[in-house]
């Protein structure tokens, strides 16, 4: 992109619900973006996207979409375990990347993705939408002003009803589980409001959450501060 008024042409890897219900509509409403292409391995999803959003290009191969020279940026709403692979491949094709949270499954994956982005001169961003809301900015402003005093303890709870037992959110091998899926929200927010992070300790406890054996709560202790988080997901009985 060589001019400030050029619109960003987006390609989307996968027709996940968050893509079709939130991000694609947002791109279409944006004054500086164009929904250019979608890739999915399921032809029926491509047909739906083409009919619903009048998508100019559809691909059954992620690689083929990445090779499209007209695409500037890639949005990745794939399962968590695939973020590293396709973020790095997108960077290698010279595409900027907006990747769904959590951006990686561990620090090593994140470092690889950051290194690839720097190597190929592209922007990599994790899709935490709340970081740019007026409410979040106001909360941070108040906390950092000292009006409430020093932060000594943070407790957060993030709960929702997951009615589909077959969801990838219940598959550990794909990076599913409440800790990855929603636990990253309170962790990310805490990192925004607590400037100094000198040491991190974590303990996960709790009984298995059906239908997969995953922990449902954890405590994270940071130097001079304690952050307690409960992450729970339940299916309908």
Predicted regions and their residues:
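Hydrophobic residues in well-ordered beta-strands that form the structural core
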Residues: 19, 59, 98-99, 124-126, ...
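Rossmann-fold dehydrogenase core element
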Residues: 112-129, 150-153
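N-terminal Rossmann-like dinucleotide-binding module
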Residues: 1-53
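Beta-loop-alpha module in the N-terminal Rossmann-like domain of NAD(P)-dependent dehydrogenases
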Residues: 44, 53-116
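Predominantly a Rossmann-like dinucleotide-binding segment in NAD(P)-dependent oxidoreductases
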Residues: 130-210
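Core-facing hydrophobic residues within beta-strands of well-ordered domains
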Residues: 7, 33-35, 55, 71, ...
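A short helix->loop->beta-strand "cap" motif at the edges of active sites that frequently abuts
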Residues: 55-56, 93-95, 120-123, 225-228
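NAD(P)-dinucleotide binding in Rossmann-like oxidoreductases
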Residues: 207-218, 222-237
